[in-house]
Amino acid sequence: MSTSSINGFSLSSLSPAKTSTKRTTLRPFVSASLNTSSSSSSSTFPSLIQDKPVFASSSPIITPVLREEMGKGYDEAIEELQKLLREKTELKATAAEKVEQITAQLGTTSSSDGIPKSEASERIKTGFLHFKKEKYDKNPALYGELAKGQSPPFMVFACSDSRVCPSHVLDFQPGEAFVVRNVANLVPPYDQAKYAGTGAAIEYAVLHLKVSNIVVIGHSACGGIKGLLSFPFDGTYSTDFIEEWVKIGLPAKAKVKAQHGDAPFAELCTHCEKEAVNASLGNLLTYPFVREGLVNKTLALKGGYYDFVKGSFELWGLEFGLSSTFSV
């Protein structure tokens, strides 16, 4: 058996201990394992520590403010103001100025039917209008082709963090990247029941869109990785979903703790942000259609790391080799 280590992975090729003079049939055999410490390697893929379900806390009871109550408060406020002005007539000029200011302010935040305008809705509207004018209308050929279908060369796993949109960081154009974003840019191992959403995305990208590259991109100051290193994972939970999700990165945490246990927490986070990318690359190998693409050399796996503090980007590849096993 020969083993090579690439970016924290041992890619092993198995061959028989003895040769045979009998007729043999060659078939490819691939083995990959993720190192969880500096001194030893595991022959199994990363697995979750706990298989017990996590029950969400009860939904909060929300009591809406009734219009009648709102009206009553308004009437009381007006009555109090009128009473104050009757008692202190010298305040009328000041009150008139204040009322004028309030009227002007309400005029900019309310529509004609009295419903408050949403700044978020306005931002979405103006954003789309800018996109339509500056990009969509100026690229009729591109969007005409995209109307017929998509054939992106990249599938990208990136973090949901609002600061690290891969389309902006890597200047992807529409139709270039099939993107999956989640907390800490994690790829879970193959599990048809538990991670069907991720599995469906990978299956669609590889088998139907025929992407030629899958790229997992980590980033600096990742809150998900900070949580991975901070949560005790002792059976108690302070979140409904986050702790269970970031458990996917536990092999990366174990390796970083073993190799850099005495480092400051911020440094541990940086190491783990990168090692979690390698763990996800290892998990991608548990998907049969990904392995098939690697065997056929129609697919490549890459890891990336974006440091938005320094303005730098690292890229590395997961090298994949084959040997042949013998069946008599």
UniProtKB/Swiss-Prot annotation:
Pfam family name, one: Pro_CA
Name of protein: Carbonic anhydrase, chloroplastic
Enzyme Commission number, as recorded: 4.2.1.1
Subcellular location: Plastid, Chloroplast stroma
GO cellular component, one term: chloroplast stroma
Domain of life assignment: Eukaryota
PROSITE patterns per the UniProt record, alphabetical: PROK_CO2_ANHYDRASE_1 (PS00704), PROK_CO2_ANHYDRASE_2 (PS00705)
Effect of residue 203 to A: 100% loss of activity
